[in-house]
Amino acid sequence: MWHLKLCAVLMIFLLLLGQTDGSPIPEVSSAKRRPRRMTPFWRGVSLRPIGASCRDDSECITRLCRKRRCSLSVAQE
């Protein structure tokens, strides 16, 4: 009879031990974290959509920068 009690105690212990591994405790931070900004390297490397501001043709997905905007056509009225 004592082995049934021991088995029950071990099962309860194992169940409780499994619960402690469930989810991490969230860190309490007094200061809000800022989202990471894109570095100048990635800002220059990433291709921009039509209508986005640009400095030269290499920044645009269409490879056409007209009047500091990414354009779809070569000649713009």
Curated annotation (Swiss-Prot):
Entry keyword set: Antibiotic, Antimicrobial, Cleavage on pair of basic residues, Disulfide bond, Secreted, Signal
Pfam families assigned: LEAP-2
Disulfide bonds: 54-65, 60-70
Domain of life (superkingdom): Eukaryota
Subcellular location per the Swiss-Prot or TrEMBL entry: Secreted
GO BP terms, alphabetized: defense response to bacterium
Keyword Signal: yes
Region forming the signal peptide: 1-22
Propeptide, residue positions: 23-37
Record Gene3D superfamilies: 4.10.40.50
Gene Ontology CC terms, in alphabetical order: extracellular region
InterPro entries named in the record: LEAP-2
Function: Has an antimicrobial activity.
Entry similarity comment: Belongs to the LEAP2 family.
Protein name, as recorded: Liver-expressed antimicrobial peptide 2
Organism listed in the record: Macaca mulatta (Rhesus macaque)
